[in-house]
């Protein structure tokens, strides 16, 4: 943290140690994983980090998707995912398996949430990416999380791109309004995509100005609900020249913020 401060920066969010299949399937050593992540949460809170994210095994169904490289304007390359291209028998967890996953999730949050409340750090959940139907942290899943854990320390690392993969820009605007007015959006992953699982059984990640969403409208909606957290450019496409994609994304976000500030 001290080194980051020497560069004039602040830590906005950290990722806790992963909860793997070992814990989610209740295998030997499972409790060690939970103890490890609980200890890490306390340490980050003591260091003054405001937000922590917990990643969990089993919240996506990668076997349903075929990944490919998509090429876009000027030759830049990005991730594409297609359900339509996937061949063979596609198995997903049944109801009992999904319920067991949820029970294990509740075990984790029942441990972490009291620590977060005591230590003054927020727990931010990222939606399931790819958001296939019945993924545990999809559109219904997050409602389930905040119903089970109504603490103000529990909220969303809201990923605009992931949720657009589910059903386009309309779902993003609705969810920002819904979760934002409840104070549940702690941080934003800002990413644009083309198509969605609902419209094409596929999607492709693109630069912020090159997808289906109007990112200015997204920021305008965030302003309306009073969001004042961090905007994180996410899954940056590869532009020839190393860090050019990151520079382009940051520059574009700064331009959007300047335009927003100039509005009467």
Language-model segments: what does each one mean?
Residues 54-59, 127-129, 234-236:
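Short, well-ordered beta-to-alpha junction loops that form the rim of enzyme active sites
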Residues 105, 123-129:
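Short, structured patches in soluble enzyme cores that scaffold and shape functional sites
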């Amino acid at each position: 943290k001290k080194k980051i401060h020497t560069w004039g920066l602040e830590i906005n969010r950290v990722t806790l140690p992963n909860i793997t299949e070992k814990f989610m399937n209740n295998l030997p050593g499972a409790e060690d994983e939970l103890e490890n992540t609980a200890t890490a949460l306390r340490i980050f809170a003591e260091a003054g980090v405001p937000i922590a994210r917990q990643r969990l095994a089993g919240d996506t169904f990668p076997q349903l998707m075929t990944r490919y490289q998509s090429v876009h304007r000027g030759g830049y390359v990005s991730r594409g995912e297609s359900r339509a291209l996937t061949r063979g028998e596609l198995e997903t967890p049944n109801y009992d398996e999904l319920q067991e996953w949820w029970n294990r999730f509740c075990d984790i949050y029942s441990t972490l949430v009291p620590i977060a409340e005591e230590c003054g750090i927020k727990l931010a959940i990222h939606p399931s990416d790819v958001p296939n139907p019945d993924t545990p942290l999809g559109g219904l899943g997050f409602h389930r999380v905040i119903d089970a854990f109504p603490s103000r320390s529990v909220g969303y690392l809201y990923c605009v791109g992931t949720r657009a993969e589910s059903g386009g820009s309309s779902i993003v605007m609705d969810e920002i309004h819904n979760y934002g007015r409840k104070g549940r959006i702690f941080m934003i992953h800002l990413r644009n995509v083309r198509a969605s699982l609902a419209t094409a059984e596929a999607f492709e990640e693109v630069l912020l100005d090159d997808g289906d969403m109007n990112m200015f409208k997204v920021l305008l909606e965030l302003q309306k609900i009073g969001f004042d957290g961090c905007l994180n450019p996410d899954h940056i496409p590869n532009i020839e020249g190393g860090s050019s994609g990151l520079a382009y994304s940051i520059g574009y976000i700064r331009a959007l913020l300047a335009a927003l500030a100039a509005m009467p």
